[in-house]
């Protein structure tokens, strides 16, 4: 599954204890991952690091943090494709993520192949959307 692509940039909102494993799982793809721990870091990193093709975020955050993070991610230009990860995925979660513009839901723990495939599909979708947007200008 380790198919290399031109520098796919990922913005990952994942707990510190998950970051090393995720970096290891995605290393064969040659991606660049910027980890953030809160929405303040998102503002700072997005301004200084350019655009991202993929954003990875959890399905649940305390105190409506998910909606705060979601609203900030959707304001990035160009908007990255959002992969939401969860311990379990119901139809309600999956359809809710798609309804608000997310790309997909992936269930953790995910295998190397699952996370690599999800990232590559999201990055392809991002590139197609950007190409279509340029064609419509």
Sequence positions of predicted segments:
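Alpha4 helix (beta4-alpha4-beta5 surface) of REC/receiver domains from two-component response regulators
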Residues: 68, 86-104
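CheY-like receiver
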Residues: 2, 7, 124-137
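C-terminal output helix
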Residues: 110-119
């Amino acid at each position: 599954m380790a198919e290399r692509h031109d520098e796919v940039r990922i913005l990952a909102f994942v707990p510190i204890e998950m970051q090393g494993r995720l970096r290891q799982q995605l290393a064969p793809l040659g991606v660049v991952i910027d980890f953030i721990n809160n929405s303040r870091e998102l503002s700072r990193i997005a301004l200084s690091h350019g655009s991202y093709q993929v954003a990875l975020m959890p399905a649940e955050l305390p105190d409506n943090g998910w909606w705060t993070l979601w609203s900030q991610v959707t304001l990035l230009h160009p908007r990255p494709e959002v992969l939401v990860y969860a311990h379990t995925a119901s139809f309600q979660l999956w359809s809710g993520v798609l309804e608000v513009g997310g790309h997909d839901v992936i269930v953790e723990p995910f295998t190397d192949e699952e996370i690599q495939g999800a990232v590559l599909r999201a990055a392809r979708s991002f590139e197609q959307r950007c190409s279509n947007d340029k064609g419509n200008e």
